[in-house]
Regions:
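Bacterial N-terminal signal peptides that target proteins for export
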Residues: 1-10
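C-terminal motif of bacterial Sec signal peptides marking the signal peptidase cleavage site
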Residues: 17-19
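C-terminal cap/linker of serine protease catalytic domains
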Residues: 22-33, 121-123, 145-152, 195-231
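A conserved glycine-rich beta-strand in the N-terminal activation segment of trypsin-fold
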Residues: 23-30, 46-75, 96-99, 184, ...
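Conserved active-site neighborhood of the chymotrypsin/trypsin-like protease fold
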Residues: 24, 70-151, 171-173, 227-231
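A short, Trp-centered hydrophobic/proline-enriched beta-strand micro-motif
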Residues: 35-52, 140-142
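Catalytic nucleophile loop of clan PA
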Residues: 64, 177-199
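Flexible, gly/ser-rich surface segments that form the specificity/activation loops bordering the active-site cleft
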Residues: 124-172, 178-182, 200-210
Length: 231
């Protein structure tokens, strides 16, 4: 009986310790994701058709809200997805669909800025990619909208985690999968939520290697745009 009581006491103590233990880092990532979600959007474009028999082509991408106010909101995304778009609609918060307009294209990097007439949206926190060369192996994550499918119409953000594999010239190499539709979405540090890159591409059919544009390149583009337009 004494042994049973001791075992019971130990079990209760263990349960109490678990309940009082600090949260694991994974809980921090969950909190970061919930904070980022309202600032990550889906872009759907109608493009000129590659074949004369088609009326138009459809392209999808993701983006991050980087500026917002009473005038509307600006979204950072990739140039290759939106260049030449005839029509564009941006889905905000998984439900609200509003027209979008390309207002700037970076002639050097694969970056674009899109504006929507949706005011006062939460914006992402842009970090720095300058010191990432010494931080290979650090955990990173990306968020975006995979191409719409038969499951839920593509109106749900997807989260992928991995590690920073290498910092190449004008590119971050990551050990994580990038699927169509996620290009343009944010790459962020899993422990802080700071944006360090813009999802760009993957290598051919290799699903486990992805690339992102360093956020410092995007910030220089944004600064040039702001300076030219008096912001």
């Amino acid at each position: 009986m004494i042994r049973k009581r001791m075992l019971c006491g130990l079990a209760c103590a263990a349960a109490l310790l678990c309940a009082c233990a600090p949260r694991y880092p994974d809980d921090r990532l969950v909190s970061i994701v919930q904070k980022l979600k309202p600032s990550v959007v889906m872009l759907a474009m109608r493009l000129p058709p590659e074949h004369a028999s088609d009326a138009y082509d459809v392209s999808f991408a993701s983006g991050s809200v980087v500026a917002s106010g009473a005038w509307g909101s600006d979204i950072l995304t990739v140039r290759h997805a939106v260049r030449g778009a005839w029509h564009m609609f941006v889905t905000v918060g998984n439900t609200h669909k509003v027209p979008g307009k390309v207002i700037a294209l970076d002639p050097v990097n694969d970056i674009a800025l899109v504006r929507i007439a949706r005011p006062n949206l939460p914006v992402v926190a842009l970090g720095s990619s300058g010191e990432l060369a010494t931080q290979t192996g650090r955990e990173v994550a990306l968020m975006g909208y995979p191409i719409p499918d038969e499951i839920d119409g593509g109106l749900r953000t997807s989260l992928v985690t991995g590690t920073l594999s290498a910092v190449r010239k004008n590119a971050l190499e990551m050990s994580l999968a990038v699927v169509p539709g996620e290009s343009g979405g944010p790459v962020f540090l899993a422990d802080t939520g700071e944006i360090v890159g813009v999802v760009e591409a993957r290598i051919g059919e290799e699903p486990s290697i992805g690339f992102a544009l360093p956020i410092d390149d995007a910030k220089r583009f944004l600064h040039r745009y702001d300076a030219a337009h008096g912001f």
